[in-house]
């Protein structure tokens, strides 16, 4: 990488393949959008898809992993049980937590995942296959259930500053439902230390037609994954 940034258009996701460590998976493919080959040291970011009936065998990572469900429904198995997640749901898996993904539905299950620090190719992507007991019947995510405190859900209504009164919210008002609004930009935190994340964060950003984030930098890496709409960005004086 000749610059300190990388931009990849959505059609490149067609290059998705099955990672070497997931050779025993069925119906699984992943597009590594950001990783070690790009010069990243803090970040691994990719989009995943699990076909109907597909299964990703139980494994753990030596990095922290957060996810955001883009489409379909799937089941996440951990030692704490099985959790059914769908579009808009998100969560965080701490370092060394055994987990398994499966799709028991009839449509593709798609999610984006953030990994920190960057998985290393020379160490098998810092991922290890491990046994995991059958998790039983999957329960639906309830953000008020302390058993699922490392997970959450976000919808378009959560990003609307005019729909934040208690009678319009499905959950109790708290900092978990708070919005940060400035210069035409709306920000809602998803994964942070409240979910026990220590190595990364994940948040949703919405720009109004005249929204602007001025020139700035960070002492860390940052990845943007566009869900809808268009925006103009300038990185290292290059405009996209």
For each of these PLM feature ranges, what is it?
Residues 1-42, 126-199:
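A short, N-terminal "cap"/entry segment at the start of jelly-roll beta-barrel domains
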Residues 27-34, 46-61, 184-187, 203-218:
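Conserved short histidine dyad/triad with adjacent acidic residue
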Residues 38-39, 58-62, 118, 193-198, ...:
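Short, low-complexity cationic-aromatic patches
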Residues 40, 75, 86-89, 95-123, ...:
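Ligand-binding loop in jelly-roll beta-barrel domains
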Residues 45-49, 66, 82, 90-92, ...:
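Conserved hydrophobic/aromatic beta-strand scaffold that supports enzyme active sites
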Residues 55-87, 217-240:
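A short beta-strand-loop-beta hairpin characteristic of the jelly-roll/cupin
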Residues 176-178, 183-240:
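Structured core of small recognition/catalytic domains
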């Amino acid at each position: 990488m000749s610059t300190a940034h990388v931009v990849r258009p959505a059609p490149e996701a067609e290059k998705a393949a099955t990672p070497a460590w997931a050779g025993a998976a069925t119906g699984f493919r992943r597009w590594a959008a950001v990783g070690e080959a790009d010069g990243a040291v803090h970040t691994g970011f990719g989009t995943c898809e699990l076909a109907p009936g597909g299964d990703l065998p139980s494994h753990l990572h030596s990095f922290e992993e957060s996810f955001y469900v883009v489409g379909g429904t799937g089941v996440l198995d951990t030692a704490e049980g099985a959790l059914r997640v769908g579009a808009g749901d998100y969560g965080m898996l701490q370092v060394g937590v055994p987990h398994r993904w499966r799709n028991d539905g009839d449509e593709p299950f798609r999610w984006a995942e953030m990994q920190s620090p960057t998985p290393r190719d020379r160490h098998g992507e810092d991922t290890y296959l491990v046994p995991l007991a059958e998790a039983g019947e999957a329960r639906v995510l309830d953000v008020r259930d302390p058993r699922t405190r490392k997970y959450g859900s976000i919808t378009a209504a959560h990003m609307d500053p005019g729909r934040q009164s208690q009678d319009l919210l499905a959950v109790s008002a708290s900092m978990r439902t708070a919005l940060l609004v400035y210069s035409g930009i709306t920000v809602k935190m998803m994964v942070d230390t409240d979910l026990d994340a220590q190595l990364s964060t994940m948040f949703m950003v919405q720009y109004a037609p005249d929204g602007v984030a001025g020139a700035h930098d960070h002492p860390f890496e940052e990845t943007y994954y566009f869900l809808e709409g268009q925006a103009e960005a300038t990185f290292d004086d290059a405009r996209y």
